[in-house]
Every structure is written in structure tokens, then in C-alpha cells.
Amino acid sequence: MRTGLIARKLGMTRLFKEDGTHVPVTVLHLDQVQVVDTRTKERDGYTAVQLGFGQAKPKHVSKANKGHFARVKVEPKKKLVEFRVAEDAILEPGATLSAEHFLVGQKVDVTGTSKGKGFAGAMKRWNFAGLEASHGVSISHRSHGSTGNRQDPGKTFKNKKMAGHLGDERVTTQNVEVAHVDAARGLLMIRGSIPGAKGGYVLVRDAVKRKRPEGVAYPAALQADAAASEG
């Protein structure tokens, strides 16, 4: 199991194929994604890598984090995230990952925070049918109807589908396809839509329900390796 990547969602566009058909894609940007720290079995009880995204202004970094970044000699990062990895996939702090970490056509899992929609009714939140348009129904056309049973059990059960807060939660979309990779500009283009608003952070991993395709870089595709192969 190798590390994933952290990226920022730029929005959606489309790519044109040679036959003229087009594919809707979501554009993700990798901005100086570096390994900041590692977790080892001996010290932490598990193996993982901590990745940092972007470059933060020093005034926005706490003293504790300044010391953390100084210890590993990495510029302060805007966002930190941790990926569990196998013992043979641990990377050295300071290594910069490339968009070529994923291959065109590869299936990936993308995790993001869905758009918050505020307080929503049962029809929008749970796709309920609502009540009758007439036949004695008034005012309650979009309500969810009864929530309980009778004197026994005499309560509304926990997790009953009702009106409430919709969105703004962690969502993972599985088995989406990598449509295009632009390593020079640090862009990943994923076929279709993925969770989250423009400007939000997303995590991209190898699909857990698919075998890792042949030819992917292991333990990771680093920018120095990509530059050497282009040269």
C-alpha cells in the first residue's frame, strides 16, 4: 500500500478526444506536495507518511508547527494530511511528489468535504416522496409523515430519517478514472464529478477495490525522478 496525494479542487471542464467526443473532468492541482514526516512501527506503532500541501506564510503558522517544519527542513505548509502506507513505501522527509504518481486510466478513490446545504427537508435530504397533493392533505405536502409507532415503543428511534443538516461531511467517491495527467503544471484530471466545492482540499488514493495497475511508481512518483525521465 503506497501513499496517496493531497490536492486542491479547481473546478470542472472537459477534454476532447480524437474522435470529437468530450469527457467531463474535475481538475485537481498539486502545489508543492512534500513529505513532511513519517510514522514508524517502532516509534508510533504503525507506518505512515505525513504530506504537506502548498506554502504557508510564517505569520499563519503556530510556534509548535514552526518547530515541526524546521526539524525536517521543510517550508511551512498550508495543509497537513497523513496516509497509512506499507513498511516498504515510507518516503524520506522533503521528497516532493509528482502528478505522475497516478496513471491515465487508473481507478482512484477521492475523499473530500461535500458542499454544505444547510437545513434541508426530508424530500431533499433523503429523497422521500412526500405526501399527497390533495385528498385531505394541507400544508404538509413535503413533510416526511409519521416518525414513530404507538404507545409501544413510545419513542422515535435514533437515526430515523428526518429533516436536518445536509452536506458538509466527509465523502469518498470510489473507482473514478484518471483522465489526464499534466506533471509540468501539477494537474490531475479526474473523469466526472468529485465531492467538495471549488478550492477545497481532496485526498486521492489508489482504488481499494481494484488491483494496482502495472507501471505505477512504487513507492511513489517524485518530481526529481519525473524531471530525470523527461531529460
Curated annotation (Swiss-Prot):
Methylated by PrmB. PROSITE patterns: RIBOSOMAL_L3. The modification N5-methylglutamine is found at residue 151. Keywords: Methylation, Ribonucleoprotein, Ribosomal protein, RNA-binding, rRNA-binding. One of its GO terms (cellular component) is cytosolic large ribosomal subunit. One of the primary rRNA binding proteins, it binds directly near the 3'-end of the 23S rRNA, where it nucleates assembly of the 50S subunit. SUPFAM superfamilies: Translation proteins (SSF50447). The keyword Ribosomal protein applies. One of its GO terms (biological process) is translation. It comes from Granulibacter bethesdensis (strain ATCC BAA-1260 / CGDNIH1). Part of the 50S ribosomal subunit. Forms a cluster with proteins L14 and L19. This is Large ribosomal subunit protein uL3. Belongs to the universal ribosomal protein uL3 family. One of its GO terms (molecular function) is structural constituent of ribosome.
